[in-house]
Amino acid sequence: SKVKRAEKRYDIELERLRRETDERHGYMKARLSTVYSSIYGYLWKSMFRMSAQRVGILQPHPLSHKQYFSCSFEIVEPDSGIQSCKREFQFKRMAEWSNFVSRLGAEDWMIYTDIENIKDKKVYAEAHRRGVRSIFFRRLTDVDGDWIGTLYAEFFDPVTDPAIFANIKGEMERKAMLIQ
């Protein structure tokens, strides 16, 4: 009958669309997996080249009307007993960290060779609680210059040597260019 033929055509079309969607999602998953593994690779190499104890990326979201920020990627020095802070830094409301976040989005670099120089009490308390003594932030932007994230490196000793400082800054600059 006409109804059965129409249902059969509908089922065939639905199955075709399902297969197409699965293929597209499979491609996207594979592509995302490649991108994510590249980013983790860059972070891993950076951590060792800079002798950092923790390296990661903070990202605002949603990008259209930034309300939150989260630690989306993080590498921690292995076998050091250092705990990851990625789980703690998820869906932080920007309104609660407004001074810090506005600076992350506006300044290319925020560098604290000694956290005692951090004026934002909330950021200071968080860094101090985690045992951080020096922290470097490098803003990441898209092709239009809009803020899409911040690369950070944390050190458990103050960074005072100018050669080490220059090495860290150079390494972060190179990785920022690769990640953006």
Q: What is each residue range found by the language model?
A:
Residues 75-130:
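Regulatory sensory and allosteric helical modules in signal-transduction proteins
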Residues 133-142:
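A short, aliphatic-rich beta-strand micro-motif
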Residues 147-180:
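Juxtadomain coupling helices with adjacent low-complexity linkers
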Residues 63-69, 79-85, 143-147:
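Short, solvent-exposed loop/turn segments that connect beta-strands within catalytic domains
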Residues 1-77, 172-175, 179-180:
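Intrinsically disordered, low-complexity terminal regulatory regions
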Residues 51-53, 131, 147:
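Short loop/turn motifs at secondary-structure junctions
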Residues 131-133, 152:
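Short, solvent-exposed, Trp/other aromatic-anchored flexible loops in extracytoplasmic proteins
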Residues 61-62, 116, 154-157:
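Short, flexible beta-strand-to-coil junctions
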